[in-house]
Amino acid sequence: MQEHLVVTLDGKDYLVEPGTNLLEFIKSQDTFVPSICYNESMGPIQTCDTCTVEIDGKIERSCSTVIDRPMTVNTVNNDVKDAQKEALDRILEKHMLYCTVCDYNNGDCEIHNTMDAWGLQHQTYEYKEKPYEKDYGPFYRYDPNQCILCGRCVEACQDIEVNETIRIDWDREHPRVIWDNDVPINESSCVSCGQCATVCPCNAMMEVNMEGNAGYMTDTEPGSLAAMVDLTKKAEPGYGPLFAISDSEAEMRKERIKKTKTVCTYCGVGCSFEVWTKDREILKVQPSHDSPANKIATCVKGKFSWGHINSDQRLTKPLVRKNGEFHEVEWDEALNVIADNFTSIKEKYGPDALSFISSSKATNEESYLMQKLARQVIGTNNVDNCSRYCQAPATKGLFRTVGHGGDSGSIEDLEKAAMSVLIGTNTAEAHPVIASRMKRAQKLFGQKIHVFDIRKHEMAERADRFYQPKPGTDLAWLSAVTKYIIDHDLHDKAFIEEWVEDFDEYYKSLETFTMAFAEEATGIPEAELIKFAEECAKAESVVICWAMGITQQDIGSDSSTAISNLLLVTGNYRRPSTGAYPLRGHNNVQGCSDMGSMPDKITGYQSIEADDIRAKFEKEYGVKLNPKVGKDNHEMVEGVHDGEIHSLYLYGEDTGIVDSNINFVQAAFENLDFMVVQDEFLTFTATFADVVLPASPSLEKDGTFTNTERRIQRLYQALKPLGESKPDWKIFQAIANKLGFDWNYKHPSEIMDEIARLTPLYAGVSYERLEGFNSLQWPVHPDGTDEPILYLEGFNFDNGKAKLFPLSFDNYFKQDEVYDIHVNNGRLLEHFHEGNMTYQTPMIKYKVPRAFVEISPELAEDRGIHEGAEVKLISETGEAVLQVHVTDRVKGKEIYIPLNNDAMENGDLGAINLLTNSDVDQYTDTPSYKRTSCRLEVIAKRGKSPLNPNNFRVNKKRHPQYSVQVQKKWERPDYVFPGNQVDK
């Protein structure tokens, strides 16, 4: 194959790699060619025709031209300019330029910028208004009269996010963007990811919060606005002066609109973007092609759910309980109360009578200081975080087999794998941006997706193969598939020989895991498992993603281990697009654990029991550290009931709602001598506290998060803390100093420098290396090099070899005769966890106002109930009253309850964890949330649906197509390619 091709661009020769996009090459040489419909994150769409150039004497679109031969390209001759002007004129026929009074006049309107850069002074075709009104959804609106039909929104919806709602109806007299079968936005299958508004090159598709708020004159009434536009156009002879005025106004906006890079504070994907603020008002969230985890993608939460920042429910002053009621106090008083109580409890009962729970929503630096406060200042290892509730079993399984508790590679690897296997993960709702990458890979590039889940969620519907095992039985089929692969000589013998140990012992342990055994245990037909095993073994590359459907079982650690065993046997580690991906739930649950907020590990998973590790930290901290492993979250609650724990300090965690068996947890809170809660809001858990401290959310501080792919990213302060709230790191420092220590951090970067000194995984991390959209994936070496793909140099054991780990299985699913219904639970797309943050955004609450229970059509028929029925669910530990949504996403006696119950408004009413019990995974103490059974009593047989009728789940169907179907435009009788109009 020829290495380079000669391209002559405007008379100058260049050597270009074959396969290069011509438009991208032209741009790389700082040569201007208009390209309004083109976006580097989406590729050629071919609707605008503005990028025409002359290629070997013929006018063609440069965006869709691949350099596959030597070619001569001209971007400046008269024919090219005439063709480009024709295309630009046609755009202005559809789009009125009223830039100065347009909310989009912020320096990045691609129509304005293109016309200005090209030098267009007058348009040939008069603007023609279309017979359509604006269409408003809850978060964005569409203005057909400003739409140029570039199709970016369609490409984004169909082939980037792959939500498959938006398309262009090219058959109309006046084509326009439509939703589904031409219904209003708010009545469509749209999931409000907002990417259509992100990629729109003008003001046709725009965030509702932007409208009337961005410019100095954009809040003008429509009639007055039209008059201003007409007056301006009559006063100026051409577009040059108009652009000069609008450019000046756009420059003025920089004084009022602040653009700050941040990282999403919801799930573990780690989407980064700029947040646009005017004073405290959040105008929009704008992702970038430079965003390393998400590129231009977002979900409804990251794009639109920021109501919590300015919510009137925010805490703005410390609260101290006096005579049974909370009273606002000054910071010094609150800190004194904390210091006095911590001191007295420590003196009376010892340091291990105090306990600390860190937040997976807070920054790395804050998580580090929480564990430092516990270990250095108090002298206890009783510190933990919410990974105990979800991810600890996955980490345990990976520590056993490959040595690192994190994703094997990057999100990009998930997209490029030949086969993706999803086990117990509702990826489309819990990690929607990752799901979009997989959906795109399947739709456009043929990735095979296999889903194992008890519930038919979106990824199950889209899967090439969907398997429904009985609850809690995944270990059985995973081990049986692994045995079958070895038995039939399909395993990667060379990989195992070089990189894996304990094979013989492991293989012997598989003796009982026959396919017949797996079918009996799981209910999946043997033939289906055999076919999966053969496809898995033969696939060029395999990734396995899993989440709480695996980890929140009493055998979560063993099931996670079985996943890694299968990957090792098939040689699916140490290569791009292979490996294990335990999808982290919270934005910083990975980082919180990395930072040592764990009872047995200090930063970077260094053992607190190791003398040399303690010595290193003792030198830094200036105190002796407690060598005794502390209590985890589960043990803390038990410890309160046993009289061993007397104080609890937690922040950014609504433990009284999200822990299992919350009646038992809440009783523990009542038994504490002293409790401190630190949060944005007076959460349900905070109502049990003695002191409540007002904390600042992510937009009000600097710091770093570490996402599910081990990617460390900076977030920058966009707003001042509201009222007297403070960033968590400042609060920890104030408490430490009240207790006699001398913490003197001026900025979180100093905290990260300390972390890097003490933590090999983060040794090369610095704020300078994380500037802007730069990121690093641990382990980060002292010179700043990182490891996007783990294990390339060997596995994280002394000899560099992975370990196959023998397992057994006797966890058969048996339905109780009394508690005859199995309770599944998890997230919804619109809400995050219990919903404390998301319920503060009114339109999110409008879409999903409350928790509910999904019931199968067959169970509904059996119990004589209908949509909206009210039922009481009763388990061994408690009861919950919920409304019914009847759906085939669940089957038989399986039900599903979302986690969000708006506890700040409803308390624990309807909370799933009224039903869960205290059973845990034996190795990690992770609650068996998914191992819950109940019985059902009917209160009312029918009622109003718990879902808003405009929710996308209610009888809404997707409308898939490939791209914008531009050929339909080309087939219209009123279309002529501009290049064909040029008079040669």
Swiss-Prot record:
GO cellular component: membrane
Sequence similarity: In the C-terminal section; belongs to the prokaryotic molybdopterin-containing oxidoreductase family.
UniProt protein name: Putative formate dehydrogenase SAB2186c
Residues reported to bind [4Fe-4S] cluster 2: C147, C150, C153, C200
Residue ranges of the region described as Formate dehydrogenase: 252-984
Source organism of the structure: Staphylococcus aureus (strain bovine RF122 / ET3-1)
Highest rank taxon of the organism: Bacteria
SMART domains registered for this protein in UniProt: Molybdop_Fe4S4 (SM00926), NADH-G_4Fe-4S_3 (SM00929)
Residue stretches making up the 2Fe-2S ferredoxin-type domain: 3-79
Cofactor needs: [2Fe-2S] cluster; [4Fe-4S] cluster; Mo-bis(molybdopterin guanine dinucleotide)
UniProt-annotated binding residues for [4Fe-4S] cluster 1: H95, C99, C102, C109
Top EC class for this record: oxidoreductase
